[in-house]
């Protein structure tokens, strides 16, 4: 069995812990029953991951597989990772969604993706990454009484993501610690109206309006101070035609939405200005986690 799962970009500026979308940058995991458990890791951060005593995917997979079957079988796991760690591209959510899905598939127990999303809450209490990782597309998600409610919209093929991946990380915990304890009403209203406009733009496919309505007063500015070059990234991307330019999750990656024809000029200028950063043009993923048997 082979399972693939996409990277995700969450928050999208003002949509804190609520908005997210899936990118066509995928981790792939091959799982085969075996006489003994073995793990092979290739791709992004492979050398670091090989040094860890515990494998997060394997632990989650085995827990759910045992719960579903009552068995403690052995498996060969082969990872080919393309999602970088700790860069705000949903690497943890990708692991969680893929592991739970793989357990159900290997146990041959029927499931729906909303079941996978809600099980994932045990490991990731914020639904903005886990939902698009499971479903693909642009997702709006709300957590209420330990249940995720969500809506999904397919992202048109004429759009691209230009992602800027810095050469250093921003710790998610440190990013959350940088948040204020209290916010004034004006800032809260700004975020509500901006997040609402982003949602309406994606569902109506009227993306031009994004150039004028994306504004965050809750988290971005403080988090971006950890990688101050990101302020220049945003300035250049918007100048070169990006529809919106926001921190991806808690960072350090910066997400830029653009029309396909504008993406290449944005990419070229950013690449010339930030030679130590990794710049990628990515299509969007409308499928989410996917299994090949």
From Swiss-Prot:
GO terms for cellular component: cytoplasm. The keyword Amino-acid biosynthesis applies. It catalyses: L-homoserine + ATP = O-phospho-L-homoserine + ADP + H(+). It holds the Pfam family GHMP_kinases_C. The keyword Cytoplasm applies. One of its GO terms (biological process) is threonine biosynthetic process. Its EC number is 2.7.1.39. Pathway: Amino-acid biosynthesis; L-threonine biosynthesis; L-threonine from L-aspartate: step 4/5. One of its GO terms (molecular function) is homoserine kinase activity. It comes from the Bacteria. Transmembrane segments: none annotated. InterPro entries: GHMP_kinase_C_dom (IPR013750), GHMP_kinase_C_sf (IPR036554), GHMP_kinase_N_dom (IPR006204), GHMP_knse_ATP-bd_CS (IPR006203), Homoserine_kinase (IPR000870), Ribosomal_Su5_D2-typ_SF (IPR020568), Ribsml_uS5_D2-typ_fold_subgr (IPR014721). Catalyzes the ATP-dependent phosphorylation of L-homoserine to L-homoserine phosphate. Belongs to the GHMP kinase family. Homoserine kinase subfamily. PANTHER family: HOMOSERINE KINASE, HOMOSERINE/4-DIPHOSPHOCYTIDYL-2-C-METHYL-D-ERYTHRITOL KINASE. This is Homoserine kinase. It comes from Nautilia profundicola (strain ATCC BAA-1463 / DSM 18972 / AmH). The gene is thrB.
């Amino acid at each position: 069995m082979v399972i693939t799962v996409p990277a995700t970009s969450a928050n999208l500026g003002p949509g804190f812990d609520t908005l997210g979308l899936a990118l066509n940058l995928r981790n792939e995991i091959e799982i085969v029953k075996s006489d003994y458990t073995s793990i092979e890791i290739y791709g992004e951060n492979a050398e670091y991951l090989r040094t860890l005593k515990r494998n997060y995917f394997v632990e989650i997979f085995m827990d759910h597989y045992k719960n579903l079957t009552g068995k403690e079988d052995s498996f060969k796991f082969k990872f080919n990772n393309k999602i970088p760690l700790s860069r705000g591209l949903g690497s943890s959510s990708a692991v969680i969604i893929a592991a739970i899905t793989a357990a159900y598939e290997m146990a041959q127990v029927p499931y729906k993706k909303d079941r996978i999303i809600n099980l994932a809450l045990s490991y990731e209490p914020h639904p903005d990454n886990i939902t698009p990782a499971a479903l693909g597309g642009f997702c709006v998600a709300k957590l209420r009484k330990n249940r995720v409610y969500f809506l999904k919209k397919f992202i048109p093929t004429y759009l691209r993501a230009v992602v800027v991946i810095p050469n250093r990380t921003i710790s998610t915990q440190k990013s959350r610690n940088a948040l204020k304890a209290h916010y004034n009403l004006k800032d809260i209203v700004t975020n509500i109206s901006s997040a609402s406009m982003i949602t309406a733009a994606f569902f109506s496919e009227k993306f031009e309006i994004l150039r004028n309505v994306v504004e965050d007063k809750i988290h971005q500015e403080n988090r971006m101070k950890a990688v101050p070059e990101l302020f220049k990234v945003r300035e250049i991307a918007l100048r070169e035609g990006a529809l919106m330019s926001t921190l991806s999750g808690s960072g350090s990656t910066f997400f830029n939405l653009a029309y396909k024809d504008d993406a290449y000029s944005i990419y070229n200028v950013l690449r010339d200005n930030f030679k130590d950063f990794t710049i990628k043009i990515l299509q969007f993923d409308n499928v989410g986690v996917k299994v090949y048997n």
